[in-house]
Structures are given as structure tokens and as C-alpha cells.
């Protein structure tokens, strides 16, 4: 049976529903890029989906078999019409080194500018759920992410939620007390030039978790973006455009609150009832 679908093979082709056989091991970059496709059913539990494999296609739904443990590279589903997504079980892939965790943004699913995406469902008993920077940028209907109580650790990258940018998740909801939460980048700011303390940023509007949970403890000690400058918004992959150029401080790590007028505020948190 077929094992590989090579780069650009079905680019700009027309399909309705596709079933990918259990023999398939690899869908390479842009294999279905820009295609007119409705639904994909994956039979293999270990198929790898390459970067931009379904980029800017009309994909509405993709179904994985129970226990799917393949690797989905970044931007595989960028600008598709997906409405929901079941996050794979990555425990084995991380333990076996199939995902290089030394990268700044490891290979985990991202959904930039998936404007119809409303829900992402995470599996139980995950040792790590890693949300890359810009993974949910430009997803206005995805208002929150909910993590099961059995989740051990969540790393949340820069997704730019602010009072003047609400096209990424507004809330992170933790159902358990023992889930650890960490910022997913080196982004921080200094209150003034002589401040030696790093003020870590998690770019979300609010953290919801049980009282005395690890997530609430983290929420009490991190900051969030209050308002982005035009320069920052210019970097949001076309979500905003202007003539002032792009500000790179937020990506660079050391972010002086005064340098580009970016403003921050303490993280809002709420106890889960």
C-alpha cells in the first residue's frame, strides 16, 4: 500500500471526503496545500503530517483513530476551515525523542488563522501539553482552552491576547489542582531600566483553576499584555497592517515596557467552582 504522499502532490486539487490508509506513514509539506477538500479520515495511528500539509485548504474536519500518536508539524492546518480538533496523545513521542524539545517551538499542532475553529479537545493523562507561540493566532471563535484534571504540565506560548487583540484564546481553564503552568517563551519585561527582576508574561486574558492549585499560584505571579502597539500587531501575520513597521521586542525576550509603548497588567484569575 501507499506509504508516502510527497510534497505538493495534491496541491490545488478538488476532493470531497478522503480516507488515508493504515499503510500511510508520511504526508509531506503542502501535500494537500490550497486544495478544495471537506473531510479527511486517518486510519494510521502513527502517520506524520508535514508542515503546511493542508495549508489554506478548505478542510473542515479531520478524524484520527483512537490512540493516534503521530507527529503533526507546525502550520499543517494553517488557514483551514476546521471547526474542532482532537489533540493527539504525545506521551510516547516526547519520551522517545520523536519531538525535539530543545527547539524554541517544538513540532506541535498549530492553527494560525483558522477562523472557524471553536474547540480543541485534549486527551487525558498527558505529561505535557505544549502550545506553541502563534498556535492559535487569528482564531476569533476559540475563546478558551480547557485542560483535563489529569494533565501534568502545560506550556503556553505567546498568542498575543490583549484588550485590543482578541483573536486568540481569552481563557485557560484548568480542571485539576496539580497541573503545572509555564510560559512558553523567554518573553518578559523590565519595569524600568534598573530592574533586575524578570516579569514573566503569559499572553492570555484570564486563568481559571481550582483554589490553591498550581495554575492559580502561577497566575498570581505572572503578567499579561494589556495593550499591543500598532507595530506589534503588524507582526500578527496580516491580522493588522500599518505603515509603522514591526516591533520585535516581544519575540526577543527582554521587553522594556516603555520602548514601544506596550503596556502590561497583572494576570486576572478566577477560582473554578
Q: What positions do the PLM features span?
A:
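C-terminal capping region of solenoid repeat domains
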Residues: 221-273
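A structural signal for leucine-rich repeat
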Residues: 77, 111, 159-164, 186-190
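Leucine-rich repeat
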Residues: 109-111, 197-198
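Structural signature of tandem-repeat unit edges
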Residues: 1-4, 13-26, 35-48, 57-71, ...
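Short, aromatic/basic amphipathic alpha-helical patches
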Residues: 185-193, 197-198, 215-226
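Surface-exposed intrinsically disordered loops and tails
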Residues: 97-104, 190-199, 236-238, 253-256, ...
